[in-house]
Each structure stands twice: as C-alpha cells, then as structure tokens.
Amino acid sequence: MLAASVLRLTLPLCWLVAPQPTQPERLFHSRDRSDLEPSPLSQAKPIADLHDAQSFLLKYGWSEIPSPKESAGVPVGFTLAQAVRRFQKANRLPASGELDSPTLAAMNKPRCGVPDTRLPPRAALPTPPALLTSLGLRPRARQKRFLQMLFPKPDGQQEDASDTGASRAFSKKTLTWRLVGDAYSSQLSGDEQRYIFRLAFRMWSEVTPLDFREDRTAPGTMVDIKLGFGRGRHLGCPRVFDGSGQEFAHAWRLGEIHFDDDEHFTPLSSDTGISLLKVAVHEIGHVLGLPHTYRVGSIMQPNYIPQEPAFELDWADRKAIQRLYGSCKGSFDTVFDWIRKERNQYGEVRVRFNTYFFRNSWYWLYENRNNRTRYGDPLQILTGWRGIPTQSIDAYVHVWSWGKDERYFFKGSQYWRYDSENDQAHTEDEQGRSYPKLISEGFPGIPSPLDTAFYDRRQQLIYFFKESLVFAFDVNRNQVLNSYPKKMSQVFPAIMPQNHPFRNLDSAYYSYAHNSIFFFKGNSYWKVVSDKDKQQNTRLPLNGLFPKKPVSEKWFDVCDVHTSTLNM
C-alpha cells in the first residue's frame, strides 16, 4: 500500500529577481505575426527503457532519491517494481510491476511537471550530478535547494486543510497576477494570452472568495502570481523543460507558473494542440495549494486530457479549493424564481423555472437540478435584463394566478413591469402610460423605498417589507389589508426565541424547488414554515421562521469575480 503523502505543491521561488524595464519589448504587439520566423520546436526524449522509467518515477515522486552508497537511479526503500506498481494502480493499469507497453505509454503522456506524490522524509543526502540531470534539474543546483523544492516546509502563509496534501498558499483574498513582459509565448499573441489567463483566474474566482486582479505596473516583487513561457533552461528556474511532448508546465512555491514554449499551446477556439486555458487552470490550482489527483473529471489530474472544450471545475475540485479558502458569502439585493412556459414535442405546455440571485450590478442563475450556479456566472444585469435598473434592485414580484401573470421589479420609489415574452421591460401599460411608475400609484398604501417583497400564491397576497413592518397587499382589490401594516415578528414569528431577522430584510422569495418561502439577511437565511411542515408538526406556528442557517450551506458558489472579467 502506498505509504506516501501527496506532495505539497508550493515549491520555492525561482524567478530571477532583476530590474525589469517599464515597457519591455514583447514578441507581438498589434502587428501580424506571419512575417516572423519561429525557431523550430525541441522534441522531448521519449521514455523508452528502464533508465528513463527510473528517472521518471524519481522526478514525479513515485520513488525515493538514492543515497551516494546506492547506484544512481535505484529507489531507496521501495524496489522499482513497487514504484511501477503504484504508478500503474494510480493510472488504472494492471498493477503487475512490469514496465510494459501500456505503462510506458502512460509515462509518455503530456503532463504537468509538478510531482504527484511525496514519499516518507529522509535525511538530506547529496545527490549525484548525473541524477539531477536525469530529473530535469541543472547539475549545479544544490542538494539542499532540490530537497526544499520537492519537500517544502510549511510557512506562515500555509495551513494544512486535510491529509490529502492540499495546503493554503495565500492568507489574503485579493491576489494580483502578471504575465511577465519578456516571457510571452511565441505561439499566441500577447492579447490572446492575457485574455486566456484572465479567464483561467476567473474560473477559480467563480467558486472561491478569491479576487484575482491583473497588475501590470507594480514592482515584480509585489505581484503575487507571475506567469511566463520559456524553453529548456528558462526564467532562472532550476528545472529544465524537456521539449514538446511531455512536461508542458510547472508551478512553483509563492506564485510562479512556467509554460514550456516548445509545446503547441492553442487558443480557446481551437480543438487541436494543448489548450492553454486548461493548462493554466490546472497550474493555478497548484499555486493556490491543490495537489495532483487521479480522480476522473478533475482538472488537477497530472496528465493532459485532450478533446474537452467545455471543461469546468467539477464538484470535488470546488470542494477541495473551498476547504482551503472557504466558501463565498455575501448579501443579496433580491432572489427569485423565474417562471416560464415551454411546449414539449407533443405540444403540451410545461412550466419551468430558474432561480436568480441579484447583487449590486451582477446576477447569477442557479441551477437547482445541479445545485450550483451556472458556469460562467455572474453576468451584468445590463446585459441580461433589458430596461430595468442596472444595479441595486430592491425587489421582484411575480403575481401568478388563474387570471394574472405579471412580473414587477422595484427600486427606490418606482416599479417596472417586465415582458417575459420579449425579454424586456414594458415601456408603457395598456392605457399608454409609461413605465417606470411610482409605487404609490400602482400599489396604493405601500411605502418606498422597499426592503423586499414576495407574492404568496396561497393567499394571493403580496407581502411588502419595510424596516420592521410588513404590508399585506390584496392583488385582486388592489389595496393593503385593513389590519396591516404589522410587525414582521408578529406575522412571521420565530420558532426559537430571538432567532429572527426582525427588520431590514435583504430578500424574500418563494422557492419552487423547495416549495418553501425563504428570508435572507446578510449571510443567513430563515425558512418559513410551509403547509407540509405544519402537517408534519401541528405545533409549529403559522408562517413561523425556522432558526437561521448560512446561505452558503444551501446555495453554493454564488461568488463575485473581478470587474475586469465580468463580460468574458
């Protein structure tokens, strides 16, 4: 059984600290690059024999570094067969321990240069220069530094998250990055590279509270994550790239990512070569503290898997990074289910719905079936909802009954009616009067601005919330009920004393996915006692509020991203 723990992927800083020109010359500017004569790509030497396989197993952590008393290339503590067997098992090959053709083929797959595993620690021993060369390291690299690269000690910025080898690499939530000016790729234009990297960082930001910002002006020592391309001996790094076909990139401790420019990196629109986006997302995962995993579907698999254009971070990758940096939190301006009618292949009308979360000028679509936000969200309200205010909406109400199907957005002292058929706000009503209208005109007796509102289909009432008061509005009579307004705590009493929002709700909505009403305030939510809850426990108060819970434990990955990446 493998007695090794996964290698911590936070390796020592290796970028040469040298003055950089304020505007370094780049390979590409805005000109066409067809006149350039690119240098021929170097090809990696394939792993073909026992010696190559030994070097591979050492380089990627499957066997231990030999001492001077042992012949170079012979693992310590584990035989070669044991190391091969462990590698085969991880790669879902028959664990024979024999260096057969399928095993050699697995070793020759394009892969990340970060080691896969870490064996039990041993005393620091000098390593023969020949072995360093076979591992892709410069012979002059000192053994102490080599061991630090493979087995880094925890520092003040790191904290173990679990026994999987993952460790938190940064203690702050806002991180800067830069594509180093003299280390652009010869494969793509500078604008393409930076766009791809912005998207790669955004994909991690969509599932964590981390905020990634490109910084092209600060001193290099102040930038958290630096990216660059090189060939062979590159960027002052002790690791030497092997040419096209095997190691395509590696990540280093304290925020460095190097890409082998001998590889055929391709842009988003290409279905050939190696996707720079996919490699970048993988290496950023290392810089943030995630190790390799051989789990199918993970972006952190060590080998490159081609022909996967629509890849995303899967559930386990999301949970792994959130164990290090936490889940996303934050209040919402409004939350609602958007109801739509569709006809199936038989012409039958089916009612569908999606949940939307609005915050500031952004919105997220929540896929209840998958229990996560839609890939690529958030988006700007401006681009998805035509004609309504572009930020800080107070409430959404869908009056839906046998005789009505009306949708309203509220902000300040005004409201807008939305046309779901044409996907835009109405500009005027049936009498030719223009929208937006004053809340006091369309909903007499309702104050403004509102905190929030929702429509209760059971009673055909709109509940409007203002500070500690609630107003029940009869949509059929177009008036507030005589006994209202009332205290929110009176209409929606707490089941547990003092466990109540009391005033200033952020949002309230009826969820068709959960058949329940929810109140939101800050990072918490309260579930309103439903008819089903009352049937199961008759002692529960009518419209009572169950104790609050964290929003992030029920609705996952509603995360902000940096404004520079909103329209990607």
Curated annotation (Swiss-Prot):
Mutating W177L leads to what result? Miri mutant, animals exhibit visceral heterotaxy, with heart defects commonly associated with heterotaxy
Q: Name one GO molecular function term.
A: zinc ion binding
Which subcellular locations apply to this protein?
Secreted
Q: What does the PTM comment of the record read?
A: The precursor is cleaved by a furin endopeptidase.
Q: Which UniProt keywords apply?
A: Calcium, Disulfide bond, Glycoprotein, Hydrolase, Metal-binding, Metalloprotease, Protease, Repeat, Secreted, Signal, Zinc, Zymogen
Q: Which InterPro entries match?
A: Hemopexin-like_dom, Hemopexin-like_dom_sf, Hemopexin-like_repeat, M10A_MMP, MetalloPept_cat_dom_sf, Pept_M10_metallopeptidase, Pept_M10A, Peptidase_Metallo
Which CDD domains does the entry mention? Answer: HX (cd00094), ZnMc_MMP (cd04278)
Identify which cofactors the protein needs according to its UniProt entry: Zn(2+); Ca(2+)
Q: Name one GO biological process term.
A: hematopoietic progenitor cell differentiation
Instruction: Provide the active-site residues from the annotation.
Output: E283
Propeptide cleavage-removed residue intervals: 25-143
Query: What S-S linkages are listed for this chain?
Result: C328-C559
- What Pfam families does the entry give? Hemopexin (PF00045), Peptidase_M10 (PF00413), PG_binding_1 (PF01471)
EC number assigned by the record: 3.4.24.-
Function of this protein? Plays a specialized role in the generation of left-right asymmetry during embryogenesis. May act as a negative regulator of the NOTCH-signaling pathway. Cleaves alpha-1-antitrypsin.
Q: Which PANTHER family match?
A: MATRIX METALLOPROTEINASE (PTHR10201), MATRIX METALLOPROTEINASE-21 (PTHR10201:SF323)
Please give the record's comment on domains. The conserved cysteine present in the cysteine-switch motif binds the catalytic zinc ion, thus inhibiting the enzyme. The dissociation of the cysteine from the zinc ion upon the activation-peptide release activates the enzyme.
Hey, which family's this protein in?
A: Belongs to the peptidase M10A family.
Give the protein name, as stated in the record. Matrix metalloproteinase-21
This chain is encoded by the gene named Mmp21
